[in-house]
From Swiss-Prot:
Role, per record: Involved in peptide bond synthesis. Alleviates ribosome stalling that occurs when 3 or more consecutive Pro residues or the sequence PPG is present in a protein, possibly by augmenting the peptidyl transferase activity of the ribosome. Modification of Lys-33 is required for alleviation.
A UniProt-annotated Pfam family: EFP
InterPro entries for the chain: Elong-fact-P_C, NA-bd_OB-fold, Rib_uL2_dom2, Transl_elong_fac_P/YeiP, Transl_elong_KOW-like, Transl_elong_P/YeiP_cen, Transl_elong_P/YeiP_CS, Transl_elongation_fac_P
SUPFAM superfamilies: Nucleic acid-binding proteins, Translation proteins SH3-like domain
UniProt-listed GO biological process terms: peptide biosynthetic process
Modified residues (N6-(3,6-diaminohexanoyl)-5-hydroxylysine): K33
Assigned keywords, A-Z: Cytoplasm, Elongation factor, Hydroxylation, Protein biosynthesis
Family classification: Belongs to the elongation factor P family.
PTM per Swiss-Prot/TrEMBL: May be beta-lysylated on the epsilon-amino group of Lys-33 by the combined action of EpmA and EpmB, and then hydroxylated on the C5 position of the same residue by EpmC (if this protein is present). Lysylation is critical for the stimulatory effect of EF-P on peptide-bond formation. The lysylation moiety may extend toward the peptidyltransferase center and stabilize the terminal 3-CCA end of the tRNA. Hydroxylation of the C5 position on Lys-33 may allow additional potential stabilizing hydrogen-bond interactions with the P-tRNA.
Pathway where it operates: Protein biosynthesis; polypeptide chain elongation
PROSITE patterns according to UniProt: EFP
Annotated protein name in UniProt: Elongation factor P
Length: 187
């Protein structure tokens, strides 16, 4: 399906440079003299790169066949991560290269959003907050009760997170996967 510039709106998924993009800004400009045009800002779905284009009346933009599906992460086998559909129990595999930075937030039995383009997975989005166990923390030699600040901790997925000094190995914490930051301790 092709869209003309009057049909473009924020959130629409389209093809630009043979890659899937989402429109994040669409501004219609009507100069005092001459034809109106649209200044459109696109964000590449896979990498997050921003593309800005000026479109004139008559320009057509191709729609992208993008589907976002909630799937449960089941297990890993070498470079493949396997996800299962909750309704049909169908399993799909996602290669390590597609996971990208999400790999450090992969916890079995959690629900992830898998983005498909023409029935091929292109992106895995972890839940915003996840619970993780602290495996190892840096030893602090100062008096912890008077110290303020953070130390580094390795969590069960292998990710490194800055945590407050009072957090010890073996504790559960809540982490924001989008920023990679510590949110709270879970008791």
């Amino acid at each position: 399906m092709l869209y003309n510039i009057n049909e473009l709106k924020v959130g629409l998924k389209v093809i630009q440079n043979k890659e899937p993009y989402v429109i994040i800004k669409n501004e219609c400009i009507k100069p005092g003299k001459g034809q109106s045009f649209n200044r459109v800002r696109f964000k590449q779905i896979k990498s997050g790169k921003i593309l800005e284009k000026t479109l004139k009346p008559g320009d057509l933009v191709e729609s992208a066949n993008i589907v976002e599906t909630e799937l449960i992460y089941v297990y890993r086998d070498r470079d493949l991560w396997f996800f299962m559909n909750r309704d049909s129990f169908d399993q799909i595999s996602v290669h390590f290269d597609i996971l990208g930075k999400s790999v450090k937030w992969m916890v079995e039995q959690l629900v992830y959003v898998v983005v498909f383009w023409d029935n091929n997975p292109i992106l895995v989005i972890p839940p915003e907050f996840i619970k993780l166990k602290i495996i190892k923390t840096n030893l602090i030699t100062k008096n912890i009760s008077t110290a303020s600040g953070n130390k580094l901790a390795v969590v069960s997925t292998g990710a490194v997170v800055k945590v407050p000094f009072f957090i010890q190995s073996g504790e559960l914490i809540k982490v924001n996967t989008h920023s990679g930051s510590y949110i709270s301790r879970i008791k």
